UniProtKB/Swiss-Prot annotation:
Keyword tags: Ascorbate biosynthesis, FAD, Flavoprotein, Oxidoreductase, Signal, Vacuole
Species per Swiss-Prot/TrEMBL record: Arabidopsis thaliana
Any GO MF annotation of the entry: L-gulonolactone oxidase activity
Pfam families assigned to the protein according to its UniProt record, in alphabetical order: ALO, FAD_binding_4, GULLO2-like_3rd
Protein's name according to its UniProt entry: L-gulonolactone oxidase 3
Domain (FAD-binding PCMH-type): residue spans on this chain: 51-233
Task performed by this protein: Catalyzes the oxidation of L-gulono-1,4-lactone to ascorbic acid. L-gulono-1,4-lactone is oxidized to hydrogen peroxide and L-xylo-hexulonolactone which spontaneously isomerizes to L-ascorbate.
Localization: Vacuole
A single GO BP: L-ascorbic acid biosynthetic process
EC numbers: 1.1.3.8
Length: 585
């Protein structure tokens, strides 16, 4: 009960602070340089391998010609190049170049041009334009962008490069790259062309190249401009239904078909499903609602530190009940405040919440700076030792998803407490995306899941019930054939991805060899992810998802974690706590 009382205090304090505070300390820039060179990190401060990424220099172009000159310089001098966005929210090491003499091209200052063509229903933006800037410009002109990721701390060039998405099986679907109708790309060229050139691609004219560039992982060149389809402005009406997860496996498909922007959040340990009833509404319907998703709101830094300390305490004492109490408190709080929906832009007063598409489709209020509040920030900001977690994101063919849900229910029913760790975060988040023409996209209508879970401060520290998370991971990617989201996941999620993509993988490589024959934009890390190859195994490699264990040493025998078969999916190999077998090293 002590943990429950403490967490309630944290929740109540956080509630009243976030009511009045919508601004916070902005995230730190991903690139930092000194006289010895530069380093680049992601927004979480730590790459999957926990190793620092180095480069010799960085350039900040502000125009397309600046961008072309930067690529030309690198091509002329045989330098490796990686593009880095202002936000750098990709979890895999895609932004890290090979070799310490490489050049980073930041698009953080390449963000001045947004051009709307009303008669064509398109908008073209510099690749460094932030999602929020783009939405505000489009909405201000009386239009809406049909979809977006739920997190707005991304640039337009960065978000399409990794396949970012919202949730929809309607129209062009929930993936932003499927709303792309044109891209300008800067690629290396021969000396007679000035060592670099701009390639302009249009839907219907250059589909072979465009289908590769839509989701490119940054290995084809530097995206200069993105042209998206837009539509007449509209509103959305949103209601959350917190209810039982009974028959979830039979309901999910109809839910995805019925609600244009619907999603489901499943808290398996709590046997609760939250169905989002999210439909389109006419622009003249009354309502100025805002989606200020709880997880993306500013958090008092002391609270973020406190929550992390509590979770570390539960881990070190193997306190499942503490995690379950936290999950109960978190879920109750989300229900109380509508998970961040606000009817008037200030507080939640009841359903439905109706607001403009641009105010409902994405959120991220913790991004924005304030001159008077320096005690609040995004909960995962690495400067403040707050939340630190893994994120597994799997994309299932619709036909395979029901069996996955049933497998997770079997795993849950053996001992629900084992899954409280993911329910502290956001449970298993379920969204819907359409089949795509992008070569690295999904080939058929699909269901996407996300789940977050605790990551230890030290790479060799095992985690409470980590075997259950690993079994779910292997259920998804191995047993049920899910593909990984390119911008998320631990390394094991990418194993065998080449085979899952099928013939489109060779089409992508053909374009890659044409646009960047010298592999200027590739690195060992992007190759590792794109090819899905398994690296050599080492002591403790399974603890952080860098391998699937096959020997005890791949876990941590000295702390009682051994390589075992899965509880439901017995072909899985996971690191499980077995205290009777502890080996003293």
């Amino acid at each position: 009960m002590r943990y429950s009382h403490t967490l309630q205090q944290f929740s109540i304090l956080s509630f009243f602070v976030t009511i009045w505070t919508v601004q916070s300390v902005p995230p730190q820039p991903p690139i930092r340089c000194d006289q010895t060179g530069c380093t680049v990190s992601n927004a979480y401060g730590t790459w999957p391998d926990r190793k620092t990424c180095h480069a010799a220099n960085v350039t900040y172009p502000t125009t397309e010609e600046d961008l072309r000159k930067a690529v030309a310089y690198a091509a002329e001098h045989n330098l490796k190049v990686k593009t880095v966005t202002k936000f750098s929210h990709t979890i895999p090491k895609l932004a890290c170049p090979s070799g310490s003499d490489a050049l980073l091209i930041s698009t953080s200052k390449y963000n001045s041009v947004i051009e709307i063509e009303p008669e064509l229903l398109t908008v073209t933006a510099d690749s460094g334009v932030s999602l929020r800037e783009l939405i505000e410009k489009v909405e201000g002109a009386g239009f809406s962008i049909g979809t977006s990721p739920y997190w707005e701390g991304v640039s337009i060039g960065g978000l399409i490069s990794t396949g970012s998405h919202g949730s929809s099986w309607s129209g062009r679907g929930g993936s932003v790259h499927d709303h792309v109708v044109g891209i300008s790309l800067v690629v290396p060229a021969n000396q007679s062309e000035g060592f670099a050139k701009v390639v302009r691609l249009e839907e219907g004219r250059d589909d072979t190249l465009l289908n590769a560039v839509k989701v490119s992982l940054g290995v084809l060149g530097v995206i200069s401009k993105v042209k998206l389809s837009i539509e007449k402005a509209f509103k959305r009406s949103v209601t959350y239904n917190f209810t039982s997860d009974v028959a979830l496996e039979d309901i999910f498909m109809e839910h995805g078909k019925k609600y244009e922007f619907g999603d489901i959040t499943w808290y398996p340990s709590r046997k609760t499903a939250v169905y989002r009833y999210d439909i389109r509404a006419p622009v003249n319907v009354s309502g100025n609602g805002v989606n200020d998703f709880l997880g993306f709101q500013s958090n008092p830094i002391l609270i973020s530190k406190g929550v992390r300390a509590l979770e570390k305490g539960f881990e070190s004492s193997k306190n499942e009940n503490g995690k379950c109490t936290t999950a109960d408190t978190t879920l109750a709080y989300k229900k109380l405040i509508g998970n961040g929906l606000k009817n008037s832009g200030l507080i939640f007063t009841g359903y439905p919440v109706i607001g403009r598409q641009g105010k409902i489709q994405t959120s991220g209020s913790c991004l924005y700076s304030s001159s008077i509040r320096i005690d609040v920030a995004c909960a995962w900001d690495p400067r403040y030792n707050g939340l630190f977690f893994y994120e597994t994101t799997a994309i299932f063919p619709v036909s395979r998803f029901r069996d996955f849900l049933l497998d997770v229910k079997k795993l849950r029913d053996m001992k629900p407490e084992r899954l409280c760790g993911i329910d502290i975060y956001n449970g298993i988040f379920i969204r819907f995306i359409k089949g795509s023409k992008a070569y690295l996209g999904q080939t058929e209508d699909s269901v996407v899941i996300d789940f977050n879970y605790y990551r230890a401060d030290d790479e060799l520290t095992p985690r409470l019930n980590q075997d259950v998370m690993e079994e779910m991971e292997q259920m998804a990617f191995v047993k049920h054939g899910a593909k990984p989201h390119w911008g998320k996941n631990r390394k094991v999620g990418f194993f065998g991805v080449k085979q899952k993509i099928g013939p489109n993988f060779d089409k992508f490589l053909e374009v890659k060899n044409k646009l960047d024959p010298k592999k200027m934009f590739s690195s060992e890390w992007s190759d590792e992810i794109l090819l899905g190859t398994e690296a050599s195994k080492y002591d403790g490699c399974a603890l952080e998802g860098n391998c699937v264990c096959s020997e005890e040493r791949h876990c941590n025998p000295s702390k009682g974690y051994f390589c075992k078969e899965g509880l439901v999916y017995t072909q899985a190999r996971v690191c499980r706590f077995s205290p009777a077998q502890v080996i003293v090293m």
